[in-house]
């Protein structure tokens, strides 16, 4: 696909690329994963009849080379954009991506850069601390207890959409020290009792 500096620039000045196959994307990563600061991949929308690299295929390739997905953006009626960048040194792992990395390693697809990211995460504790995704995140026992002690908060929590529910669960999970975690739970219970949300 050529030098990323020659591609169109958008948003945060990362290039926009499109690939037809996983092989094309992985060959690009093989050449650029250490030199590029990231890309926006144009991925075909479902139902458009356009074929090409899928999000799942793009993510697998990224993990193999030590990269990670980021924000999504609109492009046009046929394509949407997905940002991919090299994984930062202290970047958190999701349980979903951790499982994919294990599967890719088992299949012999992991490259040196991806394997190095996994090893660093295992050494510094990020591997064990991987967070659950929005679809699988469960309400922890300490939050359940806090909600049970405040019926108004418990009632409002049950009405939250998935984004606001996960925003609370993720922030509680990210608290490294028990006192910090307890304070966050107390704050979110009070917020819910006041019928307030993190996202509008």
Predicted regions mapped to residue ranges:
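Charge-dense, helix-prone N-terminal extensions
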Residues: 1-200
């Amino acid at each position: 696909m050529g030098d990323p500096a020659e591609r169109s620039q958008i948003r945060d000045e990362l290039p926009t690329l499109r690939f037809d196959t996983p092989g094309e994307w992985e060959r690009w990563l093989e050449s650029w994963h250490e030199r590029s600061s990231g890309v926006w991949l144009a991925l075909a929308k479902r139902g458009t009849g356009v074929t090409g690299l899928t999000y799942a295929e793009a993510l697998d390739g990224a993990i193999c080379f030590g990269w990670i997905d980021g924000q999504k953006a609109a492009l046009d009626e046929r394509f949407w954009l997905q940002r991919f960048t090299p994984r930062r040194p202290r970047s958190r792992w999701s349980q979903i991506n951790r499982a994919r990395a294990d599967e890719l390693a088992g299949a012999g697809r992991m490259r040196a850069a991806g394997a190095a990211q996994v090893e660093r995460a295992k050494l510094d504790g990020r591997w064990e601390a991987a967070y659950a995704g929005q679809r699988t995140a469960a309400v922890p026992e300490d939050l359940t207890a806090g909600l049970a002690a405040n019926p108004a908060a418990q009632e409002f929590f049950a009405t939250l959409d998935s984004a606001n529910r996960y925003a609370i669960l993720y922030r509680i999970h990210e608290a490294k020290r028990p006192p910090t975690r307890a304070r966050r739970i107390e704050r979110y219970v009070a917020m819910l009792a006041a019928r307030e949300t993190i996202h509008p």
